C-alpha cells in the first residue's frame, strides 16, 4: 500500500490494467476523510505511522468512463450521479469541474450531511446537525438520496463490493445503470469530466488540462497535492510533536513558494486557469476558517499572503464558483466530526472572511 508520501509517475487504466493516455491522470494516494462503520472518527489506525505521521490509504474504485467505447462505461447524459460533501476539499474539486464544464444537466449531484458520526457520511437533512443541535437519535431520518434512497454512503460501497472494509470516502461517481460505484477518486473524475463528457458540456471550450503544458502542469499539481493539499492533514492528524513540526514547516515552505510564483503571474500558468489552480483553491478556501486553527497550521494565514489571498479571491469570484462553496458545511464538518481534536464540538463563529472584495489581480 502506498503511503501519503508516495505517488507513481505513470498513467494507468484501473479497469484494463494497461497504461493510459497521458491525458489521464497518474495514480496517486488521494482520499477524503470519511468512515465506514466501526472505524475511528477521523481516520483508520492503519493510517498512522509509528512516528505519528498521517499516511493515506489507497483509492478503492478506479474504473474509467470513456467517449470512444474503450471501456465498459460510456459517457452518457443522465447515467451517472455524483455523491459529494461540500466540506471535503477532494470532493469539492469535482463539484467545481462539473460547474466549470457546465455538466449540471448531464451528471446529477447529491450532497451529504457535513456532520459525520461513527456511521459515516449520511444522506440526512443538514438542518438536523446544526451547531448546538442535539446529536441524539441521528439514525432516525429520511434519506435525501434521490437515486437509491441510501441512508449512508457506505451502502453504495457495500453494493459495489460486499467485502469492502476500508474507510468510505467522497467523492463517489455512481452508475445508475449497473448500480455500482464507477470511481471514487477525484483525480480520475475531474479529467473524465473534462474529456469524456465534453460533448455533453455547455462549456466545451473550457479545457482544464491543456496539452501544451502537460508535463509542467502535472509536476506542479503533484507538488501542490503532496505539500499543501495533503500537507494540512499531515499537520492536523500528526500524533507526535516532531511529526507535526515537520509537516507544518513543509506546508508553509510550499505556501511561500506559491506566494512567490504568483508575484508576477495572475494564475499558476499565466492568464489561463487550469486544474492545478482549482487543486490549490480547494485548500486555500478552507485554510483560514479551519486549517489555521483546527489543524494548527498557524504560522500564517492566507490573508497574510498578499498574492495568495488575492488569488483566492480571484478564483472564488469566477462565475459559478461561489455556488460550489459552503463555509458553513466546511466549519461544521471539521469542528464537529473530529472529536479527538475538538472534544466539545463547538463550532467557532469566526473568522469573518470577505470573499467578495476586489482582488486586484487584473493587471497581472
Regions found by a protein language model. Give the residues of each.
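C-terminal alpha-helical interaction module
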Residues: 2-364
Amino acid at each position: 500500500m502506498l503511503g501519503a508520501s508516495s505517488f507513481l509517475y505513470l498513467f494507468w487504466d484501473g479497469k484494463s490494467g494497461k497504461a493510459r493516455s497521458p491525458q489521464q491522470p497518474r495514480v496517486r494516494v488521494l482520499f477524503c476523510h470519511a468512515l465506514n462503520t466501526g472505524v475511528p472518527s477521523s481516520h483508520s489506525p492503519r493510517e498512522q505511522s509509528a512516528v505519528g505521521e498521517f499516511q493515506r490509504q489507497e483509492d478503492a474504485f478506479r474504473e474509467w468512463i470513456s467517449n470512444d467505447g474503450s471501456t465498459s462505461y460510456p459517457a452518457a447524459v443522465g447515467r451517472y450521479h455524483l455523491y459529494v460533501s461540500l466540506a471535503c476539499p477532494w470532493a469539492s474539486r469535482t463539484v467545481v469541474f462539473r460547474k466549470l464544464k457546465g455538466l449540471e444537466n448531464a451528471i446529477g449531484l447529491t450532497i451529504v450531511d457535513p456532520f459525520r458520526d461513527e456511521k459515516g457520511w449520511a444522506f440526512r437533512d443538514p438542518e438536523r446537525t446544526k451547531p448546538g443541535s442535539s446529536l441524539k437519535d441521528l439514525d432516525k431520518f429520511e434519506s435525501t438520496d434521490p437515486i437509491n434512497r441510501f441512508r449512508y454512503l457506505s451502502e453504495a460501497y457495500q453494493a459495489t463490493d460486499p467485502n469492502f472494509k476500508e474507510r468510505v470516502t467522497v467523492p463517489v461517481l455512481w452508475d445508475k445503470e449497473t448500480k455500482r460505484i464507477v470511481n471514487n477518486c477525484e483525480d480520475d473524475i475531474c479529467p473524465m469530466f473534462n474529456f469524456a463528457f465534453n460533448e455533453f458540456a455547455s462549456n466545451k471550450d473550457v479545457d482544464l488540462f491543456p496539452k501544451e503544458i502537460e508535463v509542467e502542469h502535472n509536476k506542479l499539481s503533484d507538488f501542490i497535492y503532496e505539500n499543501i493539499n495533503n500537507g494540512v492533514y499531515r499537520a492536523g492528524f500528526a500524533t507526535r510533536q516532531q511529526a507535526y513540526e515537520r509537516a507544518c514547516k513543509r506546508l508553509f515552505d510550499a505556501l511561500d513558494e506559491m506566494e512567490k510564483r504568483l508575484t508576477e503571474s495572475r494564475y499558476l500558468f499565466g492568464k489561463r486557469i487550469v486544474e492545478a489552480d482549482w487543486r490549490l483553491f480547494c485548500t486555500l478556501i478552507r485554510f483560514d476558517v479551519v486549517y489555521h486553527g483546527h489543524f494548527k497550521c498557524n504560522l500564517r494565514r492566507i490573508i497574510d499572503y498578499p498574492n495568495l489571498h488575492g488569488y483566492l479571491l480571484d478564483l472564488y469570484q469566477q462565475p459559478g464558483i461561489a455556488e460550489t462553496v459552503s463555509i458553513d458545511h466546511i466549519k461544521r464538518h471539521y469542528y464537529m466530526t473530529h472529536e479527538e481534536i475538538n472534544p466539545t464540538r463547538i463550532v467557532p463563529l469566526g473568522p469573518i472572511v470577505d470573499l467578495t472584495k476586489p482582488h486586484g489581480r487584473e493587471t497581472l
